[in-house]
Amino acid sequence: MSEPVLVIDNGSYEIKFGESGWDQPLRALNCLTKDKYSRFHLSNQTKKMRDISQALIRRPHELGQLVSWELESEVWDYCFYNEDDFHWNLTHDNDTKDHHLVVSETLMTIPELSKNMDQVIFEEYDFKSMFKGPVAQYIPFYQGQYQDDAMTAAEDKKTSSYKDFQLVIDSGFNCTWAVPIIKGVPYYKAIKKLDIGGRFLTGLLQETISFRHYNVMEETILVNNIKEQCTFVPPESYFSSFHNKMNTKVEYVLPDFQTSFLGYVKKPGKEKLTDDAQTLLLTDEVFSVPETFFHPEIAQILKPGIVETILECINMCPEVVRPLLVANIVCTGGNFNIPNFHERLQTELQRQCPIDWSCKVHSPQEKDKSLHGWESMKDFANSDQFRSARVTREEYLEHGLDWCTKNRFGYQQWL
């Protein structure tokens, strides 16, 4: 398309944004942070904090729903008009009035909150046109390769019918969604939600470290960094990893706010520490926390795990497409950066599925799996489907908010 298209993956933890012709998006934390000195840091300014202790974080999303456009618009302005941090400025490239927009929205968004997004996009930012939808809806448009796509031409021809049927597992900051896609359309009657995501893992790790080592209940940024650097999913089972926990132990050096502000993982060997250095020796914590995806009872949660949630989702789909969905499961979201996650998921699902079903779990080739959604949105923005499906500013002004929600972006008619 000759006209510029801005693509925004508006995640509850991090915003990925950029133009449809870019190879990589820009990234900004979707939050406002208050440090212990009562100074406020917006979005990526949080990464420049010298003292992360006792930081309070406020996000525009609550329980997965975008509820605070007062804060979200501040973060968007920071992204659009901050040339110092991003070396890109929307005012240098025409402005929002000359841009089309592709943006993500939470699944099952409350209609009134969805109307708020339409109103802000068309009345405050004046975008030329807009298309919005959940990240899972864009995944079929992904033009990149998956890690296990090295198939022969014969195999590719054999499985070509699967590509119209996908089961998208979107595991992000707030929760994990299982979304069946049939002929490019989410099958809303079978969508299932697991209330375990990145926020939950960070909170559980906080409680575990506070009980066993130091009190870190007010050190959210520190514990989140420990989670990202140290945790992994047991490749076979929790019990086998527990027996070998001393072989996978991790020693994490806590920040001293002079040489380190976030801490780091101590390399085994000759690395010497100062006399006053404080360390955490993490053994079974590094794998027991992510294991809650498969066994929530570890955290005293009496709900189905991710495997049971996926099977329940599949069983609510038409019987004829169930084996096709199982054969084409696509993983997206930041939690799939945890090592061994998608491999373990495939192993556990294959055990639970009928013996004549072939279970295949695909993971994108991107090193950071959280970028998969933005890449899919970018490919959609460059397609003809975007031109025919978008809502223009003129249509919005003519028909109004209710028309957009009911006839174009609402999901209620699919239920």
UniProtKB/Swiss-Prot annotation:
Domain of life of the organism encoding this protein: Eukaryota
Keyword Transcription: yes
UniProt KW keywords: Activator, Chromatin regulator, Cytoplasm, Cytoskeleton, Nucleus, Transcription, Transcription regulation
Principal localisation: cytoplasm
Listed GO biological process terms: chromatin organization
Localization terms from the record: Cytoplasm; Cytoplasm, Cytoskeleton; Nucleus
Listed SMART domains: ACTIN (SM00268)
GO cellular component, one term: cytoskeleton
Family, similarity comment: Belongs to the actin family. ARP6 subfamily.
Biological role stated in the UniProt entry: Component of the SWR1 complex which mediates the ATP-dependent exchange of histone H2A for the H2A variant HZT1 leading to transcriptional regulation of selected genes by chromatin remodeling. Involved in chromosome stability.
Quaternary assembly: Component of the SWR1 chromatin remodeling complex.
Name of the protein in question: Actin-like protein ARP6
Annotated organism of origin: Kluyveromyces lactis (strain ATCC 8585 / CBS 2359 / DSM 70799 / NBRC 1267 / NRRL Y-1140 / WM37)
Gene that this sequence comes from: ARP6
